[in-house]
């Protein structure tokens, strides 16, 4: 089996799925105490890196996604599948798990 090199440009979400680059979590508290990885909360904000073609309707047509590449989004805390590419963290989630677009 041939090895596949993954990068953001090679990942194309299917259906209504969205590939989001996770924002960095806080490294220390407001009081200056450094947090270990086990104490950090899972981030819920990220930037859309790739978008699928949209959900398929009953008549076979596609419903265009409401978010686009570059949008900053807020998503459900435990939604999606975590993926690490190099040193960057991503989450692949369904569009319904996106709660809001953040300006």
UniProtKB/Swiss-Prot annotation:
Record text on subunit structure and interactions: Heptamer of 7 subunits arranged in a ring. Interacts with the chaperonin GroEL.
Lineage, highest ranks first: Bacteria, Bacillati, Cyanobacteriota, Cyanophyceae, Synechococcales
Family matches, as HAMAP family: CH10
Name of the coding gene: groES
Primary localisation category: cytoplasm
Record GO biological process: chaperone cofactor-dependent protein refolding
Protein name in the entry: Co-chaperonin GroES
Top-level taxon in the UniProt lineage: Bacteria
Subcellular location: Cytoplasm
Organism: Prochlorococcus marinus (strain MIT 9211)
């Amino acid at each position: 089996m041939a090895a596949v090199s993954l990068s953001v440009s090679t990942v194309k979400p299917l259906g209504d799925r969205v590939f989001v680059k996770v924002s960095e979590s806080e490294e220390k508290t407001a009081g200056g105490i450094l947090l270990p990885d086990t104490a950090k909360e899972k981030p819920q904000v990220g930037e859309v890196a790739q978008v699928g073609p949209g959900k398929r309707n009953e008549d076979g047509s596609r419903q265009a996604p409401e978010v686009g590449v570059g949008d900053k989004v807020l998503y459900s805390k435990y939604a999606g599948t975590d993926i690490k590419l190099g040193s960057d963290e991503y989450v692949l989630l369904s569009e319904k798990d996106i709660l809001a677009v953040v300006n």
